[in-house]
């Protein structure tokens, strides 16, 4: 409280209004033992130039010399400078949905374009105006499935992102719904026999990754067929959305719901977030979809306009009728993804996806020449798991060379046969052939 713009007279007037004798009165609810009895131990004041130099020096200690090979749900991709420049426009630079939305036609049109891109890439009929992130989108999909089917069991593949599954468990902890996790096989894909045994007449949804957390392209059509036979919904979860520029759309393979994140478009890694979640469905479920939808309409003068519709969140309708309590969504992050996709276009996205696929193959071949084999035989997109002997040691060793090597899988899958050596690494358009070769030789030691 030692530095603020108010004069002593201002402070005295405010204290008189609230009936306090001093500023200390405002903190009486905090026990004395928890209060700091001395000023903070801060360095001397510095001018702006000196301060920024110090901050840059501190930031440089965390910098790596090369693009990271770490993916595991958050991916290093090039963000065109035009994305950040357009985000800075005053009309857009807020994460908030306007409380008088029809006044903000530009924002609404951007959200409408987001929904269009989501539907095009997922093969679904309807998308909402974004979710918090991929994990909460998946959890909301499970809740929607229980409402649609009237059932209470969620069957999820162990190859789905482990942290997504933790969020799912948190959401369902108080609902009484059951979560059954089915294993993946030696090829990295969901074990279809185990899936078929787990799915029954009480199953509301089957959730599989597309691609999975392990980087492989999972058996989505077969999983969807098993779910459909039991009357359950199929939820496809995508964390690496660039894959949708190459793979068949989830909707074309039998998925009823497609969720995930578009972090790979227009959004830097930023220590894991923020990242826009997407949620797309078949039209028959539109009344049960969480969040809100931006729709196009025509006003009384025949002019095209945009409105928020089907806003079944508890801020807009009675709580007991709401499909979710989602508040401020990831609107600005969704706009970044929308701008990036618009800049890429259909052909550009396909080229980007093919390049990522090719770089993953290059990574596999380079590590193969170094005598390091992939853990799983199923085809990957741009991320692979390898047995490097001691993953934690490799990560620590390469970090000293300015290379972020990947994510040790033992953190999430200690039961893996070769868990100690399991390292999950990604290769994207940022990883040049020379860098991939350097990485392979560095891992080899």
Curated annotation (Swiss-Prot):
Similarity comment: family membership: Belongs to the GcvP family. N-terminal subunit subfamily.
SUPFAM superfamilies reported in the protein's UniProt record: PLP-dependent transferases
Presence of keyword Disulfide bond: no
Protein name: Probable glycine dehydrogenase (decarboxylating) subunit 1
UniProt-listed Enzyme Commission number(s): 1.4.4.2
InterPro entries to which the protein is assigned, alphabetical: GcvPA (IPR023010), GDC-P_N (IPR049315), GDC_P (IPR020581), PyrdxlP-dep_Trfase (IPR015424), PyrdxlP-dep_Trfase_major (IPR015421), PyrdxlP-dep_Trfase_small (IPR015422)
Any Gene Ontology biological process: nucleoside metabolic process
Catalytic function, reaction form: N(6)-[(R)-lipoyl]-L-lysyl-[glycine-cleavage complex H protein] + glycine + H(+) = N(6)-[(R)-S(8)-aminomethyldihydrolipoyl]-L-lysyl-[glycine-cleavage complex H protein] + CO2
Uppermost EC category: oxidoreductase
Assembly with partners or alone: The glycine cleavage system is composed of four proteins: P, T, L and H. In this organism, the P 'protein' is a heterodimer of two subunits.
A GO MF label: glycine dehydrogenase (decarboxylating) activity
UniProt entry keywords in alphabetical sequence: Oxidoreductase
Gene encoding the protein: gcvPA
Biological role stated in the UniProt entry: The glycine cleavage system catalyzes the degradation of glycine. The P protein binds the alpha-amino group of glycine through its pyridoxal phosphate cofactor; CO(2) is released and the remaining methylamine moiety is then transferred to the lipoamide cofactor of the H protein.
Keyword Transmembrane helix: no
